[in-house]
Each structure stands twice: as C-alpha cells, then as structure tokens.
Amino acid sequence: MEDASLMCWGDNSNGQLGDGSRSERHVPISVPLGGAGVHEVSSGSYHTCAIMADRSLRCWGDNWHGQLGDGSFSDKLSPVDIEIPSNSSAVTVDSGAFHSCVGMNDGSMYCWGYNSYGQLGNGGTTRAGIPMPVPLDSTQSPTDIQVGLFHSCALFDSGEMSCWGDNAYGQIGDGTPISGGWHLPKTLVLDHEVLSISVGHRHSCAILTDASLQCWGI
C-alpha cells in the first residue's frame, strides 16, 4: 500500500492474516501493526512474515514447526517481534511451507522452522524455533532468499546462487538428486551470473545475465 500498511485476506485457520482471530476474510482487512510501516511481506502455507519499515522482523500464524521464530511453537494470531541474533537490519525474507529465512544487511542469513531435509542450511536436521545462522562465505551477502516446500535458495551480490535442503527431485540443481537432501548451502555452477531467482514447492528457476531462464526439479 502507498501508506506502507498491510492488508490480508482468505483462510485464517492458523491466524495467518494477523488480525487477532481465526476467522476467514473474504475481503482485504488491515493487519494491526501499531502504526509501523511494512517494507516487505512473505506468506507461507499457513504463516506470514514481514520486514517492517525500520527493518525489524515480525511473523504470525501457524507455528507448529517453529516457523515464526519466536521460540514458542504455538500459533500467533497477531504479529510478534522476531529477535535476530545480529546487530543488523533485515533485507529480504521468505516464508515457505513450514520454515522461514531472512537475509541481513551485514551479509548474514538465518533460517528457522521445519528442518527434516536440512532446509535450514545449518548442517543438521533438527527443527529450530528461533533463527539459526546459515554458514556462508564471508565475502557473500544475500540479496534475495526463496524458500520452497522443503528446500531453500539464496542469491548473492556476487551473482552466485546457492541452494540446500530436499533434493529428491533435483530441485537443488547440482545434478545429483538424493532423498536425504543437502544440509548446507551448495553453490550452483551456471553459465552466467544470476539476476533473479524463484523457488516453487519442488523446483527452482533463475534468470541469468544473458537474459536466459534456467529451471530444474519437478
């Protein structure tokens, strides 16, 4: 919205609309944010996360797997502040089916929620109810993060792209599908630098600097 407010509508069984209820809404309703403006919003299957105008992070809705990041594992019907263990500002956020990831302006990246396929990128498969750091090359800074069903991808300011998590259908893009998934980010080998990325449930796509489009997965 022009005034940086946020409006949501549709299913609200887990409080994903953020209006303090579980009632579905058939027309857009305003999300109460105490006058704070919204910079970016991302909706998962049953939860929502937003970067505020001051670059802080709030999430709400389904929290069964800890995908809100507040450490509680209980649904939140209204936006709650998410504490990122970094003295930096949120740049980009994406909400997947049951996990979320955020990139910070100091080049760090954090993920939380469901992790059975390593989609949090921290080397393990244990779910996390609070943001967990993703180990990255110190020379890279994430400019975009895209989260699928059970995998995640990030675009860096270097023009490189990394993916991690479920790879049963080749959605990581390294040419070696495995059912267990990759638990740490893997840098993809592409013909050119990457301009833009998008991730679906079980596939991924990238626009390259030669204006070509490449996709993989199912």
What are these regions (language model features)?
Residues 8, 47-50, 59, 99-102, ...:
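Conserved core positions of repeat-based scaffolds
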Residues 16, 47, 67, 99, ...:
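Intrinsically disordered, low-complexity repeat/linker tracts enriched for polar/charged residues
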